[in-house]
């Protein structure tokens, strides 16, 4: 059994503060045979989560505390950069921001489900704890990072 309590969360915050990445996750799987990913993630302002997508799974995100924004992008295959909303170009693939979802339990906005295949990242406004779940083992789930 894994007990999710203040002691665990405080320990994760301490590790996130000490981390250059300004974040720390905690694996909630209880068996190496478990095919899905379920984790707590502590995120601090200034952390850089690369834009990425999970082609084979939705990503379920619940915010337990703090405040962050889930940013979603759509693809625009084109050879020219157009408009200020275009983030960058990699191999002719342009990404355009199309949605920002505030996750803030203090105002009743608890989470979201990022559809399979949608490019996304997060912007952390306040130190936050999120629960993430998606199908597939880490490294075998088809996750793609944009621009790398």
What label would you give each PLM region?
Residues 1-36, 50, 81-102:
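A short, N-terminal "cap"/entry segment at the start of jelly-roll beta-barrel domains
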Residues 40-55:
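Conserved short histidine dyad/triad with adjacent acidic residue
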Residues 48, 67, 127-129:
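Structural motif
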Residues 50, 70-72, 132:
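Short hydrophobic/aromatic-rich beta-strand segments that constitute the beta-sheet cores
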Residues 56-78:
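Glycine- and acidic-residue-biased ligand/ion/polar-headgroup-sensing regions
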Residues 60, 121, 127-143:
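A short hydrophobic beta-strand segment most commonly corresponding to one strand
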Residues 103-126, 133:
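Conserved metal-binding segment of the jelly-roll/cupin
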